[in-house]
Each structure stands twice: as structure tokens, then as C-alpha cells.
Curated annotation (Swiss-Prot):
Part of the gene cluster B that mediates the biosynthesis of austinol and dehydroaustinol, two fungal meroterpenoids. The first step of the pathway is the synthesis of 3,5-dimethylorsellinic acid by the polyketide synthase ausA. 3,5-dimethylorsellinic acid is then prenylated by the polyprenyl transferase ausN. Further epoxidation by the FAD-dependent monooxygenase ausM and cyclization by the probable terpene cyclase ausL lead to the formation of protoaustinoid A. Belongs to the trt14 isomerase family. Disruption phenotype: Impairs the synthesis of austinol and dehydroaustinol and accumulates the intermediate compound preaustinoid A3. GO terms for biological process: austinol biosynthetic process; dehydroaustinol biosynthetic process; terpenoid biosynthetic process. This is Austinoid biosynthesis clusters protein J. Homodimer. It comes from Emericella nidulans (strain FGSC A4 / ATCC 38163 / CBS 112.46 / NRRL 194 / M139) (Aspergillus nidulans). In A.calidoustus, the austinoid gene cluster lies on a contiguous DNA region, while clusters from E.nidulans and P.brasilianum are split in their respective genomes. Genetic rearrangements provoked variability among the clusters and E.nidulans produces the least number of austionoid derivatives with the end products austinol and dehydroaustinol, while P.brasilianum can produce until acetoxydehydroaustin, and A.calidoustus produces the highest number of identified derivatives. Pathway: Secondary metabolite biosynthesis; terpenoid biosynthesis.
Amino acid sequence: MNTTRHRLLATASRFVETLESLDVDAMLAIRSSTCLHHMCCPSFRNYSITNDQTREAFPQWKATITKYKFGVLDDSQILVDEQARKVMIHAETAAETTVGDYNNEYVFILRMAEDCNTVDEIWEFYDTIRLQDLRHRLEASHVPIGVDAPAPFTTTASPAAL
């Protein structure tokens, strides 16, 4: 049975698989051409990036990772809103980087396209203390990261209300 719920969950599953793959082409293929990815942590930095900005910045981020695992923390906690075409995922990552281990937890809210086969919008929430620790270690090793990297990388406006 190919219900809306089934299609939403299948797309969310592919989203998670592409994040774990660290394959930027696969990561962007699951997204619509107009997808916006909102980083939603006001105590750290709020910003939104386009697919082009993701493609541009990703190689620099990937270069810091030597081993990576990403996945859903608890399948029973996945929430689906069929009418809004949204799926919420609680996920975790465990990575070895050029400056030591990095572990974090995330909540992703994915809004799918009308056909439920691609992601139109991503809201990402994460533990800012853990990310800040990684950033400090990267900076101490003189490794630029993310939006502070020297690559041409500008952000769009803050995310709209969920």
C-alpha cells in the first residue's frame, strides 16, 4: 500500500541514508531544487542554506571527517503529519574527525513536496554545546569549518516559523 504516510516515511528514510553516506550528490538528489535547510539553534547561530550552498560548503566539512555514522535514534519516536507533509526524526551521529571524536543528537523536521518523494524544507536542531566544542577544536587546529570557512558561502534569511 502506497499511502501518504508510507511515502513520507520512505522519503525520510532515504534522507537519513543519504546523510550517513556523506555523498553530497545523493544528499541533494533527495531534495527539491528549491529546498532550504534551516539551522535552528538561536543560542549558536540561525541560518538557512540552499542546495548550491550545501554543495559548495560540503567538501570542506567532509574533509574533517575520518569515520562517520548517522542514524535515527529511536524509530518509535518518528512523528508524521500527513496533512502538513512533515516528518520529525530524532537522530544521532558518531564521528571521528581530524581533531577527535564528535557525537551529537539532532531533531530534523522535514517538509516534503506534494508527491512526498523529495524534501522541500529541512529544519535542523542540534546540541550546540557539542558542536561548539568541535568548532573550538577545529579552530585550535586552524581548520576553518562551515559558514566560517573561507569558501564563498553566504546564508539566506533566518528560517520562517514552523
